[in-house]
UniProtKB/Swiss-Prot annotation:
This is Protein YcgL. It comes from the Bacteria. InterPro entries: YcgL-like_sf, YcgL_dom. Residues 12-96 form the YcgL domain. It holds the Pfam family YcgL.
Length: 108
């Protein structure tokens, strides 16, 4: 029981689900198995949610593939956060860019 005058803070958790239809796509919600605030169309495209983990957000400074402040804000305001996969690396474009820079450097 908290001491008088001390407010017990509510910890912020999120529950993360993996998409059954889209690789590297995750849905963060506030409560386990509560998708009531997630739009129906999003759920259709997401497929059957597969529980990945339950994660405390308090005291955490960062997440691996998402901005923690954006996640917290989205959970508070809309009740969910959708993490999409990072764009694929275009290795050919990177290589051509580097080669173009080398060509420019040798022509000077």
């Amino acid at each position: 029981m908290p001491k008088p005058g001390i407010l017990k803070s509510k910890s912020m958790f999120c529950v993360i689900y993996r998409s059954s239809k889209r690789d590297q796509t995750y849905l963060y919600v506030e409560k386990k198995d509560d998708f009531s605030r997630v739009p129906e169309e999003l759920m259709k495209g997401f497929g059957q949610p597969q529980l990945a983990m339950i994660l405390p957000l308090d005291g955490r400074k960062k997440l691996v593939n998402a901005d923690i402040e954006k996640v917290k804000l989205a959970l508070t305001e809309q009740g969910y956060y959708l993490q999409l996969p990072p764009p694929p690396e275009d290795l050919l474009k990177q290589h051509l860019s580097v080669m173009g820079q080398k060509t420019d450097d040798t022509n000077k």
